[in-house]
Regions:
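Extracellular/periplasmic carbohydrate-active domains that bind, remodel
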Residues: 1-204
Length: 204
């Protein structure tokens, strides 16, 4: 899709709803989400672009997304990318948002087999409170359903290796969390997460 606007929308799902995401933006470009409220049983605001090899043939990237002045009140993740991101997610700006009582604040998740690149992601002026787990987690170990039962992925198959790069997070304020940041690149491939800066500190 192209030219998607979500303005002043309130989305509520039961806390126990399996896969009860608020909004999943998949392979869309020119997206504006603002002044909206989310209370969900899973990820609240999520960017995606398809899963594994089939997505790399038929889907397009998720790109040019502007999210601002949104409230996430409970849910699994406040702002999330993945794990379906095989065609890439890029050029995203998230600012002036509040996450309260979520399991994690910001999560970017993928796994070997997904492929794709997440890049040029900016978050600023994000306020979090009562976060149950990590405020910010970037993980390549999200393996749930990442491979088909009859599919084998080899590390040397470059198109199956995902990357997170050029991620900037500034003025991230957190009141209450188990851990502020956590980075989990692919085992033996530290370069799969690189150029990550949070509140002026370079983490990768």
């Amino acid at each position: 899709c192209e030219d998607l606007t979500v303005d002043s929308v309130k989305i509520r799902n039961p806390y126990y709803a399996q896969n009860g995401d608020g909004i999943d933006v998949e392979s869309c470009t020119n997206v504006h989400i603002h002044h909206s409220t989310f209370e969900t049983g899973d990820d609240a605001i999520c960017m995606k672009s398809g899963k594994n090899a089939i997505a790399r043939r038929i889907e397009g990237p998720c790109s040019n997304v502007y999210i601002h002045d949104c409230l996430v009140n409970e849910g699994h993740g406040g702002f999330v990318i993945g794990s379906e991101m095989s065609r890439g997610v890029k050029d995203i700006l998230v600012e002036n948002c509040t996450f309260v009582g979520t399991d994690v604040g910001v999560r970017m998740k993928s796994a070997l087999g997904r492929g794709g690149v997440v890049e040029n992601i900016t978050l600023r002026n994000i306020h979090m409170s009562e976060i149950k787990g990590e405020a910010v987690i970037l993980t390549m170990s999200y393996v749930l359903n990442s491979l088909n039962r009859n599919e084998t992925i080899a590390m040397e198959n470059e198109e199956d290796i995902p990357y997170f790069r050029d991620l900037s997070m500034d003025n991230i304020e957190v009141t209450g969390c188990r851990q502020f940041t956590k980075l989990e690149p692919l085992q033996g491939r530290p370069e799969t997460i690189r150029n990550v800066v949070v509140n002026g500190q370079k983490l990768a």
